[in-house]
Amino acid sequence: MPYLKFLVAAIAGSCMLVSIAKAEELPAPIQMLANQGLTIVDTFPAPGGLKGYAAEFQGQAIALYLTADGEHVIVGNLLNLEGRDIAADPLYQLVTGPAQEHAWQQMERATLLQDGDADAPRIIYTMTDPNCPYCHRFREAAEPWIAAGKVQLRHLMVGIIREESPAQAAAIMGSPDPAEALVNHINRRERGGIEAIPRFVRIGEPVIRANHRIMRELNLSSTPIVYYRDENNHVQVIRGMPQPQQFEAIFGPRP
């Protein structure tokens, strides 16, 4: 596994997880990985004399297993007889779940493009670049639910794909009706999208800069990124264009 070589060369990017390293002295192999950039979040039970550690690195949950002699650490998946990773539930509870709730809260506090009925029963957050074709496809896929008043998309507009993306994103956010501007842009995408009118760009630029900071804080670098709550009210995230079989899980029953 190329984990260790990769970890040495990078710096951890997450601040919201509480590390147990500050509260207790870690075994040497675990401390070695903490020194290389991992955030050691907590421990969890593991079989075979191992001790599990839930860690986070650049937004990704990682399972570590300390051997009984305290001299070695195993990094990666540990499967049971059914082929299930025994760390799946602990990592979600200790790392992934809290991180995704944190991301949801950051989205709630951001300046967003509200696309759909304000009273819609289902809210979905998505990071959108004006020139991202998969963002366009996601918006088009959501249209039946938006038109029926079942879903409101809340777009965190960013500009990362093309040179003109930041100005177009700012123009959309600075326009009198950002939701209408986004739909017009998508409908005109084959002709280059909407014009980046300077007065609208000036209004929208601070929003786009703030949204880029959120992307960096969440260790995200692509679009679309979709956040939604599942039937258990847990925050789920999909990176990239969701598959059609995922639509009802995201948007709810088809109208």
Feature map (PLM): residue ranges:
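Acidic, Ser/Thr-rich peripheral helices and adjacent loops at domain boundaries
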Residues: 168-183
